[in-house]
Amino acid sequence: MIRCGVFLLMTVDTEKYLDFVAGVTSPASSDFAELLRRFTELEVKSDCDTPHLLTAALGLAAESGEFTEIVKKIILQGKPYTPDNVFHMKRELGDICWYIAQACMALDTTFDEIIEMNVEKLKTRYPGGEFDVHKSENRKVGDL
């Protein structure tokens, strides 16, 4: 560790860290043949709709990042809150909805079921119908 003013800078052996990361990475995450084997296993042994599920997960991450980038620039970097930027955010939300639809197809569900489940979860978490910081941070067992 190196002391720099009020900050402590840690020195890291990046090669050692990369070796560590490689050691704790699943075979399907590090070997193409294992990834194909896992896809095949999911296809044969379960009713997992892997193409839609993967499309949804990757797309939601990407499009949520694009939406977040606009918000970050407006709130933290001085980008103006204009009708054009609101339109851009709405377009990104539309893309997010498209990927939610992909997830619904993968999970054989509907938007309605997902929203109903969310409402029930939040009613259980906040029985009075009002947000509570303590309940949001200290959840009951099984409250995902």
What are these regions (language model features)?
Residues 2-144:
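Flexible "arm" and connector segments at domain edges
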